[in-house]
């Protein structure tokens, strides 16, 4: 079985939620981190990517560039999903951009702060037949 390939936005070194997403996604060895923009600070971004075995050419200075470049990839090289592990107030815009680039999403909670934003993302993802999952870690 082919491993799912994923990218991360946020969740760099020292970000607990990033570790939770990365470990959770790769726990059963069915997914592999292939790309990311882990920090707004380039040196921290590179450090995180190197630590997690991401090829230098797939470590990006910002998530916009990452989405643009990764959307160009095809076949076995294309990402299966993108994890969003950024501050809560950034989720809506990032998820909206990921949907526009045609990737499935796993976003940390909360995805949005308003029901209007949630309905908008649901409609956008539904038009493209994308999965938009919310990660609820350590919830019973």
PLM region spans:
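N-terminal Rossmann-like dinucleotide-binding module
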Residues: 1-54
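A short helix->loop->beta-strand "cap" motif at the edges of active sites that frequently abuts
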Residues: 55-56, 101-103, 128-130
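A structured beta-alpha segment of the ubiquitous adenosine-cofactor-binding alpha/beta core
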Residues: 58-80
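Rossmann-fold NAD(P) dinucleotide-binding segment
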Residues: 78-81, 89-108
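A contiguous active-site-proximal alpha/beta segment in oxidoreductase catalytic domains
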Residues: 112-140
């Amino acid at each position: 079985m082919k491993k799912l390939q994923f990218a991360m936005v946020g969740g760099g070194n020292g970000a607990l939620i990033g570790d939770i997403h990365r470990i959770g996604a790769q726990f059963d060895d069915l997914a592999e981190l292939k790309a990311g923009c882990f920090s707004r600070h380039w040196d921290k971004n590179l450090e995180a990517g190197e630590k997690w075995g991401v090829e230098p050419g797939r470590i990006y200075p910002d998530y916009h560039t990452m989405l643009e470049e990764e959307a160009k990839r095809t076949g076995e090289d294309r990402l299966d999903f993108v994890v969003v592990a950024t501050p809560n107030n950034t989720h809506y815009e990032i998820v909206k951009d990921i949907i526009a680039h045609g990737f499935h999403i796993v976003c940390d909670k909360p995805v949005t702060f308003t029901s209007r934003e949630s309905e908008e993302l649901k409609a956008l993802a539904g038009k493209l037949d994308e999965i938009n999952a919310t990660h609820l870690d350590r919830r019973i």
